Amino acid sequence: VSLTEQSGSFVLKDGMKIGVSDQSLFPAVGYLQEILRNVISSSVEVTTDKNQVDMYFQLKDTGGKPGSYKLQSTPEYIRVEANDYSGIISAITTIRQLLPAAIEVQGEKQTYSIPVVQIEDAPRFEWRGFMLDASRHFWNKDEVKHVLDLMSLYKLNKFHWHLSDDQGWRIEIEKYPLLTEKGAWRKFNKHDRTCMARAKEEDNTDFLIPEDKIRIVEG
């Protein structure tokens, strides 16, 4: 793991082109496009041609552990090499972290730049997890997606979605109706009084999430 910073910067600009070594990296670059949406006005072109591009992402055996990557930024271009897909995602997240926090909110478009650096990075821990407990408190789809985005920002790679306790089962799956017909209910007991009082104060209602309304994917 190393970081070398030099003078100069790579300026993000309209009309940028991003190259990838193969089409399997298109979803990863889609993540980068979402990041750049608040930075530049025009759409970002993605191509499998490595010539005349501003950023290039390549899957390549770098000799490192899974999730490792090498990132080089110059005033002219940014190049990333990674062992695997997760390394590409981590490199994109590093690009996001090198930009000012102002890119995280929509506003007037400004000129942003990335410092000239050379980075070789690899995860210290293989399992970097976060658990979301949706069994006792409802989370809508946008809130779950926001949690996943923050996980990506902090390079967490394991999402534990805690959906079931004696308090209920939170996703309706038509193939398994008993999960909600029986699993979503239980008898009242004395431990519920405090929770019910809190729920009344906060005005939060638990309810089922239809299966077709959820799209949480790995990547």
What are these regions (language model features)?
Residues 1-125:
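Contiguous, structured surface segment used for ligand recognition
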Residues 21, 135-136, 205:
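A generic structural signal for short
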Residues 26, 89, 138-141, 170:
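Loop/helix-junction capping segments adjacent to catalytic residues or to phosphate/diphosphate-binding pockets
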Residues 35, 147-150, 154, 182, ...:
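Generic, well-ordered alpha-helical scaffold segments in large soluble proteins
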Residues 88, 144, 213-214:
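Aromatic/hydrophobic pocket-lining residues that form the small-molecule binding cavity
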Residues 123, 167-219:
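Aromatic- and acidic-residue-enriched carbohydrate-binding clefts of CAZyme catalytic domains
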Residues 133-166, 173:
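A conserved hydrophobic secondary-structure block that centers on an alpha-helix together
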